[in-house]
Design a protein with these regions (language model features):
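ABC ATPase C-loop
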Residues: 150, 156-157
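The feature captures the beta-strand-to-loop junction immediately N-terminal to the Walker
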Residues: 33-35
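ABC ATPase NBD coupling module
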Residues: 65-79, 103, 109
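Short coil-to-helix segment of the ABC ATPase nucleotide-binding domain corresponding to the Q-loop/switch region
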Residues: 91-99
Length: 167
């Protein structure tokens, strides 16, 4: 599902990743461990298409990834759950979780609400759909972030310290 060949990234003079090679097949799990500043989150950001490597090749499901995800017409479905839940403060919990579904014009508002409610219940959250993120604890916000990653059938899910501050 994921293959890297000589993947490198530099921030100015600093090499963050140097010639990273790995292959992750469908159904396999990979733990990326290392000290702070070793490039763990950078690897996940590259996989999610948020940044591009300086050198090397990344393939997801056999397709070479040359563009940032937002620049692609039909990008691979990669979900990223960050240490910080990255919720939009002006949106309700339902809007934060369901924004991916709103792109699908075939789904009714009622169905979107039901799907969001089901995903929230999967992570142990109930009756929070109309709340704003700042009305929830940090652990609850983390659960919302997980619910957002569950919202549709994702093909690849990457997590950076997802259980930190999880209640």
């Amino acid at each position: 599902a994921v293959e890297t060949k000589n993947l490198s990234i530099s921030w100015g003079e600093v090499n963050v990743l140097d010639q990273l090679n790995f292959e992750l097949n469908e159904g396999e799990k990979l733990a990326i461990v290392g000290p702070s500043g070793s490039g763990k989150s950078t690897i996940l950001k590259i996989l999610a298409g948020l940044i591009l490597p300086t050198e090397g090749e990344l393939k997801i499901f056999g397709e070479k990834q040359n563009y940032l995800r937002l620049d692609q017409n039909n990008p691979p479905d990669v979900r990223l759950v960050f240490q910080n839940p990255a919720l939009l403060g002006s949106l309700t919990i339902e809007e934060n979780v369901g924004f991916l579904l709103k792109r699908n014009k075939n789904l009714s508002k009622k169905l979107i609400h039901e799907i969001v409610r089901d995903c929230l219940s999967e992570v142990g959250l109930f009756n929070v759909e109309n709340k704003l993120p700042n009305e929830l604890s940090g652990g609850m916000q983390k659960r919302v972030s997980f619910a957002r990653a569950l919202i549709t059938d994702q093909t690849l899910s990457a997590k950076t310290k997802p259980l930190l501050l999880f209640d």
